[in-house]
């Protein structure tokens, strides 16, 4: 979910054409989750092949990524590794929410409430090993690079942007700012009706407007609540900023409120400010493997062959074996 920083950021509208020629790191879990949630049948169930395997994520990756490549926008997917131990409670809460949504989905389905059934079905979405494995296989066949993070995918994606190996992170979560991404892109959707909502958030601009350092932004996040701590009841982002402006640090702000942290703040600072990232990664766009793509998508997963060939042609037209130096 990330930190609720929507009210304190001032995003700039950006046109899709401004992303042409740029490498973008993509928070794979975030994006694949959206594909699984949104690409569903009328009864709320995900898209499946004739053998019952879920294919919503493959559909999204293949057709949306090929369209990005056609527009000369170069995505690099970054996959989550092992979550920090401090995230365990957040993960358990999400599991409970999904269980409750599953219950409400079945109830809505039983009474024939299609709208409610679809809404609650989307909330049951989860990523399993098979979905991640098939996503990586598809990207390999498409010639699209991906990086396996050690821990948080957002941290790795943000690090790659901070090193100027990519221009921006594509994610809905504001955690990228705490992780040090110099730029993040929100609402990257390919339909014309949604393209007007495309947003660019600059870390430098955000910190300047808020009169905060990145370290202080992390302190504000902890006051509000992160994936690693609950935060202080009643403290939103704006109030958190006022407290940090007044007291300078999280510890002094907590003391003024007569509050304490349930976890060591230094551990959370370490996650955001010095994340465990992969330094030796390769960004290389290759030509798609047409015959293997057709076998995988059309043969194994019953995709429409004509539509799949069209997507492959988009990839072939824009990609050739090339190293990172060639793209920049």
UniProtKB/Swiss-Prot annotation:
EC code(s) of this entry: 3.1.-.-
Residues where Mg(2+) 1 binds: 27, 80, 152, 154
Region described as I-domain: 116-248
Required cofactor(s): Mg(2+)
Region (N-domain): 1-98
Cofactor binding note: Binds 2 magnesium ions per subunit. They probably participate in the reaction catalyzed by the enzyme. May bind an additional third magnesium ion after substrate binding.
Pfam hit, one: XPG_I
GO terms classed as biological process: DNA repair; DNA replication, removal of RNA primer
Keyword Phosphoprotein: no
Principal EC category: hydrolase
Keyword Glycoprotein tagged: no
Chain's role: Structure-specific nuclease with 5'-flap endonuclease and 5'-3' exonuclease activities involved in DNA replication and repair. During DNA replication, cleaves the 5'-overhanging flap structure that is generated by displacement synthesis when DNA polymerase encounters the 5'-end of a downstream Okazaki fragment. Binds the unpaired 3'-DNA end and kinks the DNA to facilitate 5' cleavage specificity. Cleaves one nucleotide into the double-stranded DNA from the junction in flap DNA, leaving a nick for ligation. Also involved in the base excision repair (BER) pathway.
Protein known as: Flap endonuclease 1
Organism: Methanosphaera stadtmanae (strain ATCC 43021 / DSM 3091 / JCM 11832 / MCB-3)
